[in-house]
């Protein structure tokens, strides 16, 4: 796993225009992490983090700019668990095709970590492909209120800050309100990989991002819960941008606090 971190750190100091390497299947990190400049909207890249653990990376246009978005794929025996859609129907269809091409195992279950379109957009594509889709009751309720796609099944036991439940090869953790009131994080104990979703920002971020549904007061406290619950995490994957280590958590808290302070000053 130290090799994974080394590979990621080397990449973070390299040019973001570098071309990503093909996916490796040996369990080793698969070269440089794909960036927004390398992925046309409608295409998806896979990046192997560890044996049986991949991130999926897509891009989407929003307000005249193009943004990257991460998700997770975890092997569960002869099946795959998908964490988050690829931000839209076209991207999610491309994701399933890429998984079939590069991994060759069926996606049987999918979890959406909060109600925004970058996490649930494409749920209908998954459902049509026979994938059982899951989210917390809060996420399902908020998605319906927003007019977004709604995962079919409810994940129970994640209603209070600090709640954690095992779901196949991963642990789902509700740290409390942050980027949204319903955001979950996902931990892969076999690989010490923490997927922070949109509750966690990449190291290069200087903005709190989309805070329309955020709880700026609680976000740093929720990040602290993640830090305390997963001190052994070696790789941390944000919802958007480059993975890194546990320092992404403190960086996120600092960015959110700075945003809140600026808002108060204004």
UniProtKB/Swiss-Prot annotation:
Positions of Zn(2+) 2 binding: 118, 198, 240
Pfam family, one: Lactamase_B
Enzyme class at the top of the EC tree: hydrolase
Remaining remarks: The class B beta-lactamase family has a specific amino-acid numbering system known as BBL, for standard numbering of class B beta-lactamases. A multiple sequence alignment was used to derive a consensus sequence and then the consensus was numbered taking into account insertions and deletions. This allows use of identical numbers, e.g. for active site residues, despite differences in protein length. UniProt always uses natural numbering of residues, hence there appear to be differences in numbering between this entry and some papers.
Activity control, per UniProt: Weakly inhibited by beta-lactamase-blocking agent sulbactam.
Organism, scientific name: Pseudomonas aeruginosa (strain ATCC 15692 / DSM 22644 / CIP 104116 / JCM 14847 / LMG 12228 / 1C / PRS 101 / PAO1)
Cofactor(s) listed in the protein's UniProt record: Zn(2+)
Record-listed E.C. numbers: 3.5.2.6
Subcellular location as annotated: Periplasm
Protein's job: Class B beta-lactamase which confers resistance to the beta-lactam antibiotics, including penicillins, cephalosporins and carbapenems. Acts via hydrolysis of the beta-lactam ring. Has penicillin-, cephalosporin- and carbapenem-hydrolyzing activities.
Chief place of localization: periplasm
A GO-annotated cellular component: periplasmic space
Binding site for Zn(2+) 1: 114, 116, 118, 179
Entry similarity comment: Belongs to the metallo-beta-lactamase superfamily. Class-B beta-lactamase family.
Protein name in UniProt: Metallo-beta-lactamase VIM-1
Signal peptide limits: 1-20
Source species, domain of life: Bacteria
GO biological process: response to antibiotic
Catalytic activity: a beta-lactam + H2O = a substituted beta-amino acid
Gene Ontology MF annotations: hydrolase activity; metal ion binding
Annotated TM spans: none
Record text on subunit structure and interactions: Monomer.
Gene: VIM-1
Alphabetical keyword list: Antibiotic resistance, Hydrolase, Metal-binding, Periplasm, Plasmid, Signal, Zinc
């Amino acid at each position: 796993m130290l090799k994974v971190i080394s590979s990621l750190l080397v990449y973070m100091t390299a040019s973001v225009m570098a071309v990503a390497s093909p996916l490796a299947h040996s369990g080793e990190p698969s070269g440089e992490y794909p960036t927004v400049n390398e992925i046309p909207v409608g295409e998806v890249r896979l990046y192997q983090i560890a044996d049986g653990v991949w991130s999926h990376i897509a891009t989407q246009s929003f307000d005249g700019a193009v943004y990257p978005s991460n998700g997770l794929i975890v092997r569960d025996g002869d099946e795959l668990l998908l964490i988050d859609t690829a931000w839209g129907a076209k991207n999610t269809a491309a994701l399933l095709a890429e998984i079939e091409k590069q991994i060759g195992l069926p996606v049987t279950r999918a979890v959406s970590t909060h109600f925004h379109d970058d996490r649930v957009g494409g749920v209908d594509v998954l459902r049509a492909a026979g994938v059982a889709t899951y989210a917390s009751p809060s996420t399902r309720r908020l998605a319906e209120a927003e007019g977004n796609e709604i995962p079919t099944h409810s994940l129970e036991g994640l209603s209070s800050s600090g709640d954690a439940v095992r779901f196949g090869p991963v642990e789902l953790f509700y740290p409390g309100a942050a980027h949204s009131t319903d955001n979950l994080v996902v931990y892969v104990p076999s690989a010490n990989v923490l997927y922070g979703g949109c509750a966690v920002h990449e190291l290069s971020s200087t903005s709190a991002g989309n805070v329309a549904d955020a709880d700026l007061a609680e976000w740093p406290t929720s990040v602290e819960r993640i830090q305390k619950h997963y001190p052994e995490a070696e790789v941390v994957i944000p919802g958007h941008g480059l993975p890194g280590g546990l320092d992404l958590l403190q960086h996120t808290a600092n960015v959110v606090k700075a945003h809140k302070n600026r808002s108060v000053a204004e």
